[in-house]
Amino acid sequence: MITTRARLALAAGASARWASRVTGRGAGAMIGGLVAMTLDRSVLRQLAAGRRTVVVTGTNGKSTTTRMTAAALGTLGAVATNAEGANMDAGLVAALAADRHAKLAALEVDEMHVPHVSDAVEPAAIVLLNLSRDQLDRVGEITVIERTLRAGLARHRQAVVVANCDDVLMTSAAYDSSRVVWVAAGGSWSNDSVSCPRSGEVIVREHGHWYSTGADFKRPCPQWWFDDHTLYGPDGLALPMRLALPGAVNRGNAAQAVAAAVALGADPRKAVAAVCTVDEVAGRYRTVRTGAHEARILLAKNPAGWQEALSMVDKHAAGVVIAVNGQVPDGEDLSWLWDVRFEHFAETFKTTPVVAAGERGTDLAVRLGYAGVEHTLVHDTVAAIASCPPGRVEVVANYTAFLQLQRALARHG
């Protein structure tokens, strides 16, 4: 039951959201949520009451996995979700307020917000994807995040924790939970988990397995896993899974989404069919016609995300554009460029035009040069696409470069 004060707070938030839209200042979800929370701090708890909620968190893949989880849960009924990725408290309030009658919710939540958000929404399931470096000026060391998540999970023993057992840090966060579903969702980026988060000793990796040399801490046996075309689950379950989205990383995201939905009672076959329909996530992965080119846009925000995005680039594309900005939301320190393995481009894309673009295109060009990647430099991303031969162009962009490109393409029609 929502109190009178909360109703007034939500009405004020709706007015703020409307004002933001009509004045052209944005969709207004954040300002609407902020206004509502300012007037009633308990509004998130009240909006979540009576719902079965899945919280999705991790450094990379939150938006995609949340979208897939919402699709899978949709086989059970109406689902409230923050589809645009506003993953802090105000965005969650806006998402739940927008669909007050849905009895299910799939919420993307920023890693550091998970403990207090879980206290408010009492999730039925919590999905733990991966942890790696991402804007250290904002969230601090990833070991701190792991300990914060671990402490938060300890307060919610009733929640099913769907954890990626290939990620050392997320495994540690979930290790002590009483209701864990382990998913082998993949973990190709291991640079940020070379030591055990529990003992500080070395993590040894061999043949897809890992273990700590200093504690009784090792990769759990997964209940869900996948290969190129099949999702495997408990009791001999094997279901064909052909996603609309590219890459092994998205098959891992889908596996965790299905596992979470099944934990809430979804039929596995229907859940898999639902995640296979997801073909775009807030503009990511979509293909846009611009002049003589079809540009597919991939988003990457940190070294691990870049490594995954680069692995999805079509080898047969007419051109590849890599766009990098260095604004505050991106992280102004671009030293991480040297952690991304661009070297494989030198061989894989030997005859394909590669264009460095974005506000920090010069920094990127230096990195590509050291990696031995033949390239040109065109700072404007739309112009960079136009400089490629006609046909399909793969565009990989970091956060603000991605947003700028979306706006520019919208203006170009």
At which residue positions do the language-model features occur?
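Adenine nucleotide phosphate-binding catalytic loops in nucleotide-utilizing enzymes
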Residues: 5, 179-304
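Glycine/threonine-rich flexible loop motifs
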Residues: 136-144, 331-335, 405-407
